[in-house]
Every structure is written in structure tokens, then in C-alpha cells.
Amino acid sequence: MATLRVDEINKILRERIEQYNRKVGIENIGRVVQVGDGIARIIGLGEIMSGELVEFAEGTRGIALNLESKNVGIVLMGDGLMIQEGSFVKATGRIAQIPVSEAYLGRVINALAKPIDGRGEIVASESRLIESPAPGIISRRSVYEPLQTGLIAIDSMIPIGRGQRELIIGDRQTGKTAVATDTILNQKGQDVICVYVAIGQRASSVAQVVTTFHEEGAMEYTIVVAEMADSPATLQYLAPYTGAALAEYFMYRERHTLIIYDDLSKQAQAYRQMSLLLRRPPGREAYPGDVFYLHSRLLERAAKLNSLLGEGSMTALPIVETQSGDVSAYIPTNVISITDGQIFLSADLFNAGIRPAINVGISVSRVGSAAQIKAMKQVAGKSKLELAQFAELQAFAQFASALDKTSQNQLARGRRLRELLKQSQSNPLPVEEQVATIYTGTRGYLDSLEIEQVKKFLDELRKHLKDTKPQFQEIISSSKTFTEQAETLLKEAIQEQLERFSLQEQT
């Protein structure tokens, strides 16, 4: 029989007592009473904040949205299939936040700022709250710098400035995403950081956009935040705020940023789904009462900061989808009232082959010519009025049997102006080439050409101008003004091209 050695037992006990570290902590714990459809009901979380992150025993995270007298309504950031009734839930004491850094440029991430492009983890030392207050009135200054989209129709007649919020609205399949992605492509070399937020879209559509960015070299200055159609409603609801937090990080570091929300209709639908499951009272179109606040607190974060804060900017281009052109629906009217203007895309124009299918007559920018360079103001000042008059005259001409010579000339000019506004996708034009194009149309140089020849003529003119008159681009880019010298150079180039073009047509 083995003898007990008291001294050894004594030694072991002493070592264990010395190593014992007593930790006393208070944790806010609750229990799951109901779970399903991305929602969990919890009892026992007595001191929880609205919007606080909670952690379930099996690792899923959630956000506390409904604080009721008997229970707390949690929206889950995952499928929650392993959460069981009666399991423990711990409040973290933190509001949702994401890591931020320059390393996010060129990456595709989800609403929790986790990479989903298979290129490894992203190193970040700083973090920002997903929802942070918008800059106040004193922190801002008025919008005065242009943000060039590369699309003639927008830059000449519906100009967008850095720090503006311009809504892109239209039916499905009218080219809304194309307008937004072309704007991102045009920021190459402009020192603008772009954030593209895809909400509730097909994975194939997002992959196509990312591929375009890679091919055109735009991913170097772009971050893509994507939550697909199969993502939980909570993550689709959070994605725009994640994108805004990343854009704000660069804005407060004295940089210019552009953020695209594609599209806010899907975010509103995700929020409606969450609210109805949380048993919040439905309002118009079954949306909850605070759906306006959902979008206003997001879009108000776009701003042009004053000189004390570094003059950084965040330009927002939210996209909203309409049903059969109905802009008087709840979400479209809400977002129209929040933004500084809207670009309407028309299905009729799209089907008629006018692309981008921008209805210039009812599109508006509330910043106006403050967001244009002087050269553009000089050449494009009356083009919107001319196009509006053309549309009116065209409608009248359908019923009139005979038109006078002036009206016929106006119709001919209008058709050519409409033709020069057409642009192929992923082909944004620099502002110098836009100025030359608009001048050619508004001064009547295209009147002698057939409508089918306009596109070919303008393409050749822009190439001829670049090759033989490089001083023109230098004058516009340096002085931002359409000087007499620039006009002389452009007139020479147009005359030379008209002669060359007529010879080509004859042969």
C-alpha cells in the first residue's frame, strides 16, 4: 500500500493556491425564449442599449433593436440555425463598429467589413462606429467643386459637385448601375476614393461590376461592400452604413470620396422585413414609421467639410428602383426629398436606343452651375433649354401636318443634340472632350450631317483634336475657361474634320 507523503501534497496545494487567480466580473446575461426568421426574443437583458451588439452561446452575433418591458428583440447577423431555446446570450456593451484603414482599397468586403474576395485578412488598427452623427452646419461649406461623371448629359446639364447627394432613379434594367459605375471609372487619376455598396443583388451582377473595375484599373481606388440577395436582412440593412463609415474615414483624412448605394429600395425592403418580424406597427406600403429616418441619417453623412476640418468631401449617389415609372411611391418620394437633386432614367428612352437613358427634362441638380467649371458653363448654358424645347416641339410635330422652316431647323438641331448625348458603357469622356463635343453641337456644326453620321464624326473629331491640337486640352485643364484661343483651336479642328469627313464620305 502506497504511503501518503504529506509534504508533497502540501507543496502541490501551495503551488495551486499561489497560481489561483480570482476573477470577478459582471456580465449582462439573458436567455433565448424564441428564435426564427432571423429574429430572437430574449429575456433577462435588463441593462442593454438600443443598437448594442449581443453574442449568443454558439457564436452568432446580433443587434438589439426592440427594447420592450418583458423581452428584447434581437436581429441576427447570421442564419442562427444553431441557436436553441433557453441558451445564454451575453451583451457586449458595444455598439456596432468596423475596422477601417487604407488597406481596404481594392478589396471586396461584406457588411461586417470582413473580406469576401479570397485574398486574405485586412490589417486595420483603427475602427469607426457603423452609425455616427452627420457633420453639423458649422462643419460644412457649400458645394463648389465639380465631380465629373464622364457622361456628357450629366456633366453639362445636371452637374454633380463634391459633397452633393444626387439620386439616380428609374425602373429596373434602365442603366442605373451603369451610370454609377461609369462615374467610378471616371475618377481614375482624380484622387477620389470610391465606395460601391451592393445591397441585395445577384452575386453574378456584383462579380460583373468587380470584373469591370479590375479591367479598367478602378479597383486601386475603390472598395466594394457587397451583401447579396441571399444574405440575412440584417446585413443588407447594415451594408450602406458600413460603406458610409469607410467613406467617412477618408473624408476626415482630407480626402475626396464618392459612395454609391445600389440600391436603397432593397435596404428599405430588408428593414421592412426586420420591422414586421419584430412586430413593429406597419405604416404606408407596410414600411415602419421610421423608414424616412433610415435613409435621412445615412444620406446626411455626405458632406463637403470646411477648411478647419481639411476640406474633405463625401459625395453620395443613392440608387432607387421604381415600379413602372412611379416616382410617387413611398421610398422614391422619401429619397427625392432628402437628396440635392435626381437623375431620372426612362425605360422608354432606353428602349428607343438613347443610352444613357437620362430624361434631361425632369432631372435636376439643386447645386446647379456651382458644380461646373467655367468652360462647361460657357458652352452648355442653354443646352438643357434647347433640349426641352425640342421635346415639346417634337410632341407637337406628331400632330402638325406642316412646320415652318424655323421649327424644322429646331427639330433637326434637337435630334443631333440628343445624338451627341449618347455614350457607350464604360466609356466616360474627360471634361475637355465634353466641352468640344457640346460646342460642336450647340453651334450648329452637326446640322449638315446625317443623324447616323454624328457619332462617327464626333469620335473622329475628338481623336483629331487630341492628336493635332493638344494645346486645347492644356488650356481647358489649366485655366478651366473656354478662352478665345481655345475657341479658335476648336473651330480650326472642326473645319478640318468636316473637310476630311466629307472627303471620306465621297470616296
UniProtKB/Swiss-Prot annotation:
Subcellular location: Plastid, Chloroplast thylakoid membrane
Molecular-function GO terms, alphabetical: ADP binding; ATP binding; proton-transporting ATP synthase activity, rotational mechanism
Catalytic activity: ATP + H2O + 4 H(+)(in) = ADP + phosphate + 5 H(+)(out)
Membrane disposition: Peripheral membrane protein
PROSITE patterns assigned to the protein according to its UniProt record, in alphabetical order: ATPASE_ALPHA_BETA
Pfam families per UniProt: ATP-synt_ab (PF00006), ATP-synt_ab_C (PF00306), ATP-synt_ab_N (PF02874)
Annotated signal sequence range: none
EC number: 7.1.2.2
Gene3D superfamilies: 2.40.30.20, ATP synthase alpha/beta chain, C-terminal domain, P-loop containing nucleotide triphosphate hydrolases
Keyword Membrane: yes
SUPFAM superfamilies registered for this protein in UniProt: C-terminal domain of alpha and beta subunits of F1 ATP synthase, N-terminal domain of alpha and beta subunits of F1 ATP synthase, P-loop containing nucleoside triphosphate hydrolases
Site positions per UniProt: Required for activity: 363
One GO BP: proton motive force-driven ATP synthesis
Record key words, sorted: ATP synthesis, ATP-binding, CF(1), Chloroplast, Hydrogen ion transport, Ion transport, Membrane, Nucleotide-binding, Plastid, Thylakoid, Translocase, Transport
Listed CDD domains: ATP-synt_F1_alpha_C, ATP-synt_F1_alpha_N, F1-ATPase_alpha_CD
Protein family per UniProt: Belongs to the ATPase alpha/beta chains family.
Function: Produces ATP from ADP in the presence of a proton gradient across the membrane. The alpha chain is a regulatory subunit.
Assembly behavior: F-type ATPases have 2 components, CF(1) - the catalytic core - and CF(0) - the membrane proton channel. CF(1) has five subunits: alpha(3), beta(3), gamma(1), delta(1), epsilon(1). CF(0) has four main subunits: a, b, b' and c.
PANTHER family given in the database record: ATP SYNTHASE SUBUNIT ALPHA, CHLOROPLASTIC, ATP SYNTHASE SUBUNIT ALPHA, MITOCHONDRIAL
The protein's name: ATP synthase subunit alpha, chloroplastic
